[in-house]
């Protein structure tokens, strides 16, 4: 368990630093398009998590430290949107279409609402 925690932590640092670097680079080069870095890391993170998940399905012998380190740590540090996308896809693939659509809708609109509420609380 300690090895898994270390793998997630170390890989998480790498993902977080990559996200920070992308944001810094975009801000320096395109300050009016601040959202481009978030969009890019979210899409790239989704691609990476899809590839990793597929590879790990094909190779179940890959140790949990590596799987958790890469998916939860690295991709999770890079973006949490990728985890949401994978969860939604897994629900769809298992035939739980209404649940997947509800989960996606609540995640997107609930997240926007929660962000707005949080911001509003700072303006009281």
Swiss-Prot record:
InterPro entries in the cross-refs: FluC
Topology in the lipid bilayer: Multi-pass membrane protein
Record-annotated membrane-spanning stretches: 5-25, 38-58, 69-89, 99-119
GO MF, one example: metal ion binding
Regulation: Na(+) is not transported, but it plays an essential structural role and its presence is essential for fluoride channel function.
Biological process annotations from GO: cellular detoxification of fluoride
GO terms under cellular component: plasma membrane
Domain of life: Bacteria
Subcellular location: Cell inner membrane
Pfam families per the UniProt record, alphabetical: CRCB (PF02537)
Keywords: Cell inner membrane, Cell membrane, Ion channel, Ion transport, Membrane, Metal-binding, Sodium, Transmembrane, Transmembrane helix, Transport
The UniProt record lists the keyword Transport: yes
Binding site for Na(+): 76, 79
Function field: Fluoride-specific ion channel. Important for reducing fluoride concentration in the cell, thus reducing its toxicity.
Protein name from the UniProt record: Fluoride-specific ion channel FluC
Protein's gene: fluC
